[in-house]
Amino acid sequence: MTTTLANRPDGEGSVQVKLDPKVNIEEGALVIAVYGKGGIGKSTTSSNLSAAFSKLGKKVLQIGCDPKHDSTFTLTHKMVPTVIDILEEVDFHSEELRPQDFMFEGFNGVQCVESGGPPAGTGCGGYVTGQTVKLLKEHHLLEDTDVVIFDVLGDVVCGGFAAPLQHANYCLIVTANDFDSIFAMNRIVAAINAKAKNYKVRLGGVIANRSAELDQIEKFNEKTGLKTMAHFRNVDAIRRSRLKKCTIFEMDPEEEGVLEVQNEYLSLAKKMIDNVEPLEAEPLKDREIFDLLGFD
């Protein structure tokens, strides 16, 4: 993969990794990229959303795009090896690999892949994501998949970790009702708008996480054209599900808040299946966010 300033393939001023057309995900699958500020709960959200899609009868694949490779452990109940680690073992001869070497079945049949990434300060995470999709295509593992969810590292929107946007139909942004999360969300909106000039990705909406109220999020939504698709309060059962290494759907529905959270994830999955209307949002300038958020 190469990129040049002259072509600007992904928006004005872009130096992002350009998508190899041979690694496109097949038409027909609903492809979602989940972004948000680091530590906001993207992996929890992605895994529970994958589980919700599976409960609705969909064949789901979740791809973790973080070198920490901790995206899917609540689905698989274990830490699974990464694609990059497995490829290194065979000197990057992907033809020597079997699907079971890098894809693992999790809760309710959800298929799980951890792309991994290069050591800190080296290589390109976007290249690893591209190689993961290429490997899945070589083994015909995307042909019968209904939903693909990319769980993406932090709020990094460089050419590398913006790579999942090149495959996605929709981007969902996870945020809390606070300044830092919304500030990061604004940067992600700008990155998605740049990608949308040349790729099919569109904004799907906002997922409010660990937030009792929505006042600051709704202020931002009103100004930019975003919409809140789901709201998850700070329910302790979600925290405990991570410690139990399981999804919220494996928790006792009699426990406080569990059934409400399960229903909210199922509702979000249904909205996405029903062809959610893509949003036309415009990011704010940094000073505008600073002046917008907070209390009078």
Swiss-Prot record:
SUPFAM superfamilies assigned to the protein according to its UniProt record, in alphabetical order: P-loop containing nucleoside triphosphate hydrolases
Cofactor note as given: Binds 1 [4Fe-4S] cluster per dimer.
Keyword flag Hydrolase: no
UniProt KW Hydrolase keyword: no
Gene3D superfamilies: P-loop containing nucleotide triphosphate hydrolases
EC main group: oxidoreductase
Binding site for Mg(2+): S43
GO molecular function, a single term: metal ion binding
Residues the entry annotates as binding ATP: G39, I40, G41, K42, S43, T44, K68, N209, R210
CDD domains in alphabetical order: Bchl-like
Binding residues for [4Fe-4S] cluster: C124, C158
Listed InterPro entries: NifH/chlL_CS, NifH/frxC, P-loop_NTPase, Protochlorophyllide_ATP-bd
Keywords: 4Fe-4S, ATP-binding, Chlorophyll biosynthesis, Iron, Iron-sulfur, Magnesium, Metal-binding, Nucleotide-binding, Oxidoreductase, Photosynthesis
EC number(s) from the headed UniProt entry: 1.3.7.7
Reactions listed under catalytic activity: chlorophyllide a + oxidized 2[4Fe-4S]-[ferredoxin] + 2 ADP + 2 phosphate = protochlorophyllide a + reduced 2[4Fe-4S]-[ferredoxin] + 2 ATP + 2 H2O
Subunit architecture: Homodimer. Protochlorophyllide reductase is composed of three subunits; ChlL, ChlN and ChlB.
Role description: Component of the dark-operative protochlorophyllide reductase (DPOR) that uses Mg-ATP and reduced ferredoxin to reduce ring D of protochlorophyllide (Pchlide) to form chlorophyllide a (Chlide). This reaction is light-independent. The L component serves as a unique electron donor to the NB-component of the complex, and binds Mg-ATP.
HAMAP family according to UniProt: ChlL_BchL (MF_00355)
Protein's name in the database: Light-independent protochlorophyllide reductase iron-sulfur ATP-binding protein
The species this protein was found in: Prochlorococcus marinus (strain SARG / CCMP1375 / SS120)
Protein's gene: chlL
